Amino acid sequence: MGVPDCLALPLLVTFLLLSLGLPVLGAPPRLICDSRVLERYILEAKEAENITMGCAEGPRFNENFTVPDTKVNFYAWKTMGVEEQAVEVWQGLSLLFEAILRAQAVLANSSQPSEMLQLHVDKAISGLRSLTSLLRALGAQKEAISPPDTTQVIPLRRFTVDTFCKLFRIYSNFLRGKLKLYTGEACRRGDR
C-alpha cells in the first residue's frame, strides 16, 4: 500500500521544496486561509497544553525561556497595519520556536524524559515549521521584512516561562490569538 514509484519522486521533491519554504506548483498558495488548517495546529497546541496541565510537578527548566506576550489589545491591533502585525507574528513565532527547541534540549538531557512530553514538543516543532512555510506562501515574510518607513515597529512584549505547562499555554494562546487574527486579516486583504 505504498506510493507508486512514478509518484514517489515528485512527491518527495514537493515535500522538500515546501520544507524549505519555496513555492511549489500545484500547492495552494493560500492554504493558511482555510480555517481548518490553522484549527488543526491550534488543536494540537491545545492538546499539549491540556496534557501538561496535568503534570504541574513535571520537569522545570533550569533557566527561564523568553516567549511572546499573547495578550491582544484589539483596538491597537485593528489600528496596526498588516505589515506591523506581520512583524509581531514573525517575532512571536521566532521566540516560540527558540523556546520549544530549548525545551526539547531539556528533555534530551533529562534522566527520565516523558514520552508524552517529547511527543508534544516534537509536534510543536513540526507545527511551527509548517506554519512558517504556510505564512511564507501567504507573503507574510515579505510584509514583515519591509514595513513602510512611516511605520515605527514597536518591539514585541515578552516574558519568561519556567515550565512545560506555561510554555504550551503561551504556544496555544499565541496561535489562537495573534496568529489567527493576523491570518484572518491577511487573507481578507488578499481576497480584495
UniProtKB/Swiss-Prot annotation:
Disulfide topology: C33-C187
Listed Gene3D superfamilies: 1.20.1250.10
Subcellular location: Secreted
Pfam families registered for this protein in UniProt: EPO_TPO
One cellular component term from this protein's GO annotations in UniProt: cell surface
Coiled coil recorded as keyword: no
Signal peptide as annotated in the record: 1-26
GO molecular function: cytokine activity; erythropoietin receptor binding; hormone activity; protein kinase activator activity
Keyword Disulfide bond carried by entry: yes
Glycosylation sites: N50, N64, N109
Gene Ontology annotations of biological process type: cell surface receptor signaling pathway via STAT; cellular hyperosmotic response; embryo implantation; erythrocyte maturation; erythropoietin-mediated signaling pathway; hemoglobin biosynthetic process; myeloid cell apoptotic process; negative regulation of calcium ion transport into cytosol
Keywords recorded for this protein, A-Z: Disulfide bond, Erythrocyte maturation, Glycoprotein, Hormone, Secreted, Signal
Taxonomy, superkingdom: Eukaryota
Similarity annotation: Belongs to the EPO/TPO family.
The protein's role, per its UniProt record: Hormone involved in the regulation of erythrocyte proliferation and differentiation and the maintenance of a physiological level of circulating erythrocyte mass. Binds to EPOR leading to EPOR dimerization and JAK2 activation thereby activating specific downstream effectors, including STAT1 and STAT3.
PANTHER family: ERYTHROPOIETIN
Name under which the protein is recorded: Erythropoietin
Record organism: Nannospalax galili
